[in-house]
Swiss-Prot record:
Covalent carrier of the coenzyme of citrate lyase. This is Citrate lyase acyl carrier protein. It is found in: Cytoplasm. The modification O-(phosphoribosyl dephospho-coenzyme A)serine is found at residue 14. One of its GO terms (cellular component) is cytoplasm. The lineage of its organism: Bacteria, Pseudomonadati, Pseudomonadota, Gammaproteobacteria, Pasteurellales. Its main location: cytoplasm. Belongs to the CitD family. Keywords: Cytoplasm, Phosphoprotein. NCBIfam families: citD, PRK13253.1. InterPro entries: CitD (IPR006495), Mal_deCO2ase/Cit_lyase_ACP (IPR023439).
Amino acid sequence: MKITKVAVAGTLESSDVQVRVQPFDSLDIEINSSVAKQFGEQIEATVREVLAKLGITAAQVIVEDKGALDCVLQARVKTAAMRATDETINWEAVL
């Protein structure tokens, strides 16, 4: 999947996460979280895993975490990535 435009998913509310995805020449992940020292590596691993499953190898991903659960982070990354592409989504593969 190729990222062709800027897209955002999520909110900045407590227990949520806002994920911004935009075109970039390589994979760049920025994590802003009050719990980054404890969970930063896990957050990055989750983001990388979701992007890999979607076949994304080049994008800038900015994660503004407000204490979201892992399942919420996965959903937000998927949603932002799908909004940021012009490709037809294979929903059977995604779900």
